Structure formats: C-alpha cells, structure tokens
Amino acid sequence: MSILKNAPQPELIPTYDGSNQSTHPSVLQFDTPWNGYRFWMAMTPYPFNYDGLEDPSVLASNDTKTWVVPDGLTNPLTPAPKPGHNCDVELVYNRDCNELWLYYVEADDIVQSWVKLMRSKDGVHWTKPEIVLHDPVQKYSILSPCVQRMQDGTWRMWYVDTGNTGYQNQSNKVRTRTSEDGLHWSAEETCEDLSQPGYQIWHLTVWHDP
C-alpha cells in the first residue's frame, strides 16, 4: 500500500541534454538559504533509459517547484567516462566545512567500479572527482550509495551490491560501511536480509532520524 499518492503531474526538472528526463534525485533542505537557495538537488539525466548521459548535475530552488542551474554553474559536473558511465548521485551537507559533498558511481561496464566525490563551498565551483571506494573486480558492486552523517559525527554509507550483473541479479545485497571523515571508509558489512519474495533490491535511500 502506498503511503503517499503520486503527484498529479511530474515536476519539470531541467537537464543539460534538454530531455528533462531525470533520475535518482538527492535533495537537501536548509532552514535558511545556503548560497542563495533553500533547496539543492543532485540528479542525473536518464533519457529513455540511456545511461550514457547519466552524469552528475546540480540544481537549486527556493520552493521545490522551480529548479534552476545556479549562475556560474555548467552541468554536468563531470562527463561520462570512456568506456563506461556515471550514475547514482548522493548529495550531503558537511557542516564541519560548510560544503556540499556529492558522491556518485562510475562503472567501466567491463570489470570495475568506483565511488567518487566532488566538493563545493558555494554549489557552483566543484573540486575534481576523487576516489573514495574502488572495486577492481566487479562492475556493479557499489550501486546507489546513500550517505548519512550520524549524531556522533561519524559517517555511514549504504549501497546495493549487484555483482557483475546489475539489475538482473537475483541475489542483490545491501552493504554498509563507516567513516570518520567521509573520505576513508571501513571494510564493508552485509546488512541483515532485506529481500522480499518477488522483488529485487535496487536503488535505495536511507534517512537518519535522531
């Protein structure tokens, strides 16, 4: 049973490719405007299921209805790798340094994958991608990373391990890691079985409610 009804019509989310077909939004809300906006979103285009344009993009809003590219920013933040594709953005506010941190997945679609991080002090100027996780032997083992800052200041990441077969994998697992700084992560642990008969674990989100 659905808790919330679907919206009568989708919101218009502009994408750099002009399709306005976006996926995997990650939205932050601020009590007062942060660099001019109360809401910041990371997302990727995904026109007609084409992952070649699934590159990290950032938008901002003050009402969640009208989303704009902030002045001075050009999407995407980083282009698609060759070979492979980007996907699965996660936007986090780091209160220690007053920065937006954007995690995303890069897969070469051959044998390996990475979680990379870009940082910004104003939402417009972003650092070059840096590697925070790397799997050299499985191309889809770190999908849909979700990062939360815990009350004690530590970080925690959850993601879906689909091995080398992606969404067709029938034994997907949810993994988790911890970190002291959001950059260096512990060895992974497997969460307790979250499988449901007839369903596959795919994209997820986690929200910490203290």
Where in the sequence are the language-model features?
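Beta-rich carbohydrate-recognition and catalytic domains
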Residues: 1-84, 92-143, 148-202, 207-210
